[in-house]
Amino acid sequence: MASLIARGRRRSFQRRVLDWYATHGRDLPWRRTRDPYAILVSEVLSHQTQIARVLPVYERLLRHFPTVSALARAPLAEVKAITDPLGYKIRGRWLHTAALRVADRPGGVFPETMEELRSLPGVGRYTAGAVMNFAHHRDAPILDTNVARLLRRHFGLAATPRARTGALWSLAAAVIPKGKGYVINQALMDLGALICRARAPRCDVCPLRRSCDFRRNAPAPTGAVVRSRPAPCRGRASPPRRPAR
């Protein structure tokens, strides 16, 4: 996929995304730590859940169980009492079982490879990549809903039922500057959540607006002033109401 993107375009994309993030990136508590346990908790809780709802649960869970060993020792019912109000109730069990498995490892050392991380319950390619980037500072592609949408729109990839497979994963890896996966993946998640939204995308303030394939190619309604935006969205641009993952 890297060979399909001109080097100049890729570098411009990286620069604009990182410059935007330096000013507009979200300040989230799990971005102030490199503890793989805390990062795993944040990713599991954030699955298909808005950040505003995740924050109090994340803070409460770590207040009660500040380490992976503390979570492993806790009764499952106590863990689920904290996590279940978010919905998707299996994640409390996932976290508890993952903690038990980590605690059983020699020295209780947290997994440090993609393969080891993906052996934990509830941990797929995305979550394993997040821990690799944010805890271990090792470049790995990350595709959540927002990043997938941003990359698909900007580089003109077709939307498919399996949009996070194949070409998109290769593209997500190709846009990472060497040694900067930690920061650009956070930047892409924020840009997708706050600007390149599924509905009413804020194209007019997007740092990538001049190079976005979907914005450039979007047809204008007959007789209307051209205000290009990613198809199929038709909403007027507006300030973000709340950040979404």
Briefly describe each language-model feature range:
Residues 4-9, 15-231, 243:
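Catalytic cores of DNA base-excision repair glycosylases
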Residues 233-236:
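Charge-dense, helix-prone N-terminal extensions
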